[in-house]
Amino acid sequence: MSEEERPAALADTILRFLCHDDIDTVKELCADWFPIEYPDSWYRDITSNKKFFSLAATYNGQIVGMIVAEIKGRTKVHKEDGDILASSFSGDTQVAYILSLGVVKEFRKQGIGSLLLESLKSHISSTAQDHCKALYLHVLTTNSNAIRFYENRHFHQHHYLPYYYSIRGVLQDAYTYVLYLNGGHPPWTVMDYLQHLGSALAGFSPCTLPQRIYRQAHTLLRSLLPWSSISAKSGIEYSRTM
């Protein structure tokens, strides 16, 4: 889509990283967007600590959206999401966790959330290269708008987490959503193994395997015995009876 076709807000949006001076604004936005209360240390970290990817979308100098994420080794993933990647991936394989993604109400449905998410994915590709295999997040089961947003961008529900959040003293359920990148995948299920086995067996004709075994045994026997006139006729008959 060209600049002329974009909504005015998106065309005039400028991206920049959060800084310490943004703390008060970010606090106000998070209080409006999310029902969860974050400690002051969290705001200091996401605006100052370089381990976080904290990107703001600004319009006329005002923050109208932001995304906060952390790229980390798979061994640092919390226990409830420890099976996001199959165990075949090494311990230094990376994943990216979205801590926060929000847009001011008046600027929603104009592509700003997608712009922020795509910027994170581009950052992952340029810094972690192909070592980052998954991008994941948590979302309230009741947040249908957020769920729709992520599902429309190819995220898939990975876990149901009962009583995951405590909101104003009330325990509420969450989902884990995952987008796999660079060949990443979850552990195989029993159905995956059965499908793989079925695909492998589909490549064999009913007699292929017995014929292979016979030919190998026949070759070995000829190399061991003093005579080499063993007929292959029985092998042909064997294949016909299968």
Swiss-Prot record:
InterPro entries: Acyl_CoA_acyltransferase, GNAT_dom, NAA60-like. It is an enzyme of class 2 (transferase). One of its GO terms (molecular function) is protein homodimerization activity. It is a peripheral membrane protein. Substrate binds at Y38, L99, Y165. One of its GO terms (cellular component) is Golgi membrane. It comes from the Eukaryota. It is found in: Golgi apparatus membrane. One of its GO terms (biological process) is chromosome segregation. Residues 193-236 dip into the membrane without crossing it. Its main location: Golgi. Disulfide bonds: none annotated. Acetyl-CoA binds at L101, G102, V103, K109, Q110, G111, I112, G113, S114, N143, Y150, E151, N152, R153. It catalyses: N-terminal L-methionyl-[transmembrane protein] + acetyl-CoA = N-terminal N(alpha)-acetyl-L-methionyl-[transmembrane protein] + CoA + H(+); L-lysyl-[protein] + acetyl-CoA = N(6)-acetyl-L-lysyl-[protein] + CoA + H(+). The keyword DNA damage does not apply. Belongs to the acetyltransferase family. NAA60 subfamily. This is N-alpha-acetyltransferase 60. It comes from Xenopus tropicalis (Western clawed frog). The gene is naa60.
